């Protein structure tokens, strides 16, 4: 990939606008972007929202196939249904653009994910919970990303201007870091697969909600 980028992806920016950056300058730029509250809070909200998806990917096969006995085809249908949910809510998010602000739609997605995680956590604490309840919890927790993902990205990039590329790189890196964190946390928890997933999801939802609250406070101060 690096070889192809170096030899075949030509720079289109005019020479007079190009920057000669070294590693120290790049790291300083990353730090400056991360310190900017208008970027940091929506970035954290979006990354930990996406981290819920990584929790699901890591645990869903064990829950649905090992615990509930779904075969490979049935699991594929369940997995595809949640992917369809993300697409469906992304479409609804677009249609609500004229009615609700970006921040309001981000909050809608956060509420959906919180509801889904609470359903999963409740199911993990009870015995012999029906499969359809777990599937509903998964659907809400995952499909809510159709709201949180694009709106968190839009809010994070809104004030970046010429730094949009670097800011996007920071956000992308943090999303995968959250995915790595989710995998590590799941490996260290010793309860059932459903309980482990629900607990990590709950932590991630909590950080996401805190970030959205901080962002709302910041927006309120800016309007005053």
What does each model-identified segment do?
Residues 89-104:
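Helix-to-loop junctions at the C-terminal end of transmembrane segments
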Residues 10-43:
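Juxtamembrane intracellular "pre-TM" segments in multi-pass secondary transporters
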Residues 1-15, 211-215:
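C-terminal membrane-cytosol helix-exit motif in multi-pass small-molecule transporters
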Residues 58-74:
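Short amphipathic helix-loop junctions that connect adjacent transmembrane helices
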Residues 72-80, 169:
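Small-residue hotspots at the loop-to-helix junctions and early N-terminal turns
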Residues 35-55, 139-143:
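Pair of pore-lining "gating" transmembrane helices in MFS-fold secondary transporters
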Residues 104-151:
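C-terminal transmembrane helical hairpin of 12-TM major facilitator-type secondary transporters
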């Amino acid at each position: 990939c690096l070889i192809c980028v170096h030899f075949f992806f030509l720079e289109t920016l005019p020479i007079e606008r190009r920057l000669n950056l070294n590693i120290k300058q790049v790291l300083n730029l990353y730090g400056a972007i991360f310190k900017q509250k208008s970027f940091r809070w929506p970035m954290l909200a979006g990354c930990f929202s996406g981290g819920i998806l990584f929790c699901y990917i890591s645990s869903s096969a064990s829950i649905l196939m090992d615990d509930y006995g779904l075969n490979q085809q049935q699991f594929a249908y369940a997995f595809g249904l949640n992917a369809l949910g993300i697409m469906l809510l992304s479409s609804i998010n677009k249609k609500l653009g004229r009615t609700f602000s970006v921040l309001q739609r981000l909050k809608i997605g956060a509420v959906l994910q919180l509801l889904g995680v609470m359903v999963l956590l409740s199911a993990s604490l009870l015995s012999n919970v029906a499969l359809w309840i777990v599937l509903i919890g998964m659907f809400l927790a995952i499909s809510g990303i159709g709201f949180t993902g694009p709106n968190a990205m839009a809010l994070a990039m809104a004030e970046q201007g010429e730094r949009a590329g670097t800011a996007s790189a920071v956000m992308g890196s943090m999303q995968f870091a959250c995915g790595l964190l989710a995998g590590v946390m799941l490996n260290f928890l010793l309860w059932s697969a459903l309980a482990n997933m629900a607990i990590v999801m709950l932590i991630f939802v909590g950080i996401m909600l805190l970030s959205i609250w901080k962002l709302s406070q910041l927006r309120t101060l800016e309007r005053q």
